[in-house]
Design a protein with these regions (language model features):
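Conserved helicase RecA-like core
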Residues: 1-212
């Protein structure tokens, strides 16, 4: 709040939090020149669309930019007028990424063995549920693999601490829900494992994109 009083040039936040602060008059939108919606496909396919549109209603006439690695046709339904797609291209296959499909009767038993076998610098194991992330992380720790669960349900301080340890190499394997699939940059990430198959292709693309 103190930083907002100093009239920053850029304000970054989640839609709900920004709307709450705006309604409290913590900042004004009268001089706003640009409104950016990052991960727009995700925003407009979840309950955040209402908050975003309330903010947009307060800034009529301001240029809006939607950013996303994947496109959701649902975005268009939230705009009164068509918007220009400045960049649109087919999703290209990164030739530096090698993908494998592993069939097993018991993936829980297979995972520790696989992680011990692969030449892993660091890895993210993606799962669909927080309970699975916690369960698998405990399993890997019992198998002498430095790991931690990661979920959007963890409080912010815990998430920041876990990601810091992961970047430093104190954690070798992050067992994560899709909270780690977008907007997180991890250098030297060598492997992404889809322990649970995601519910849509867009999520698969974002997960795999963590390896850059």
């Amino acid at each position: 709040l103190n930083a907002l009083r100093h009239r920053p040039h850029i304000i970054i936040g989640t839609p709900g939090r920004l709307l709450d602060l705006y309604n409290q008059e913590a900042f004004k939108l009268s001089n706003l020149s640009l409104f950016v919606i990052d991960e727009a496909d995700q925003v407009y396919s979840t309950g955040q669309s209402e908050e975003v549109n309330q903010l947009r209603n307060a800034i009529q006439g301001v240029q809006t930019i939607c950013l996303s690695a994947t496109k959701n046709a649902k975005i268009h339904t939230y705009f009164d007028t068509p918007f220009e797609e400045i960049f649109q291209g087919e999703i290209a296959v990164n030739e530096k990424i090698t993908s494998y499909y592993l069939e097993t009767d018991n993936k829980k038993d297979t995972l520790p063995s696989l992680l011990h076998t692969l030449p892993i610098t660091s890895a993210i194991v993606f799962v669909n549920h927080r309970s699975t992330a916690i369960e698998l992380s405990d399993l890997l720790l019992r198998n002498n693999i430095l790991s931690s669960a990661f979920s959007g349900y963890f409080d912010e301080r815990k998430r920041i601490a876990i990601m810091s340890d992961f970047r430093k190499g104190d954690i070798r394997v992050l067992v994560a829900t899709d909270a780690a699939a977008r907007g997180i940059d991890i250098h030297e990430l060598s492997h992404v494992i889809h322990y649970d198959i995601p519910i849509d292709t867009e999520t698969f693309i974002h997960r795999s994109g963590r390896t850059a």
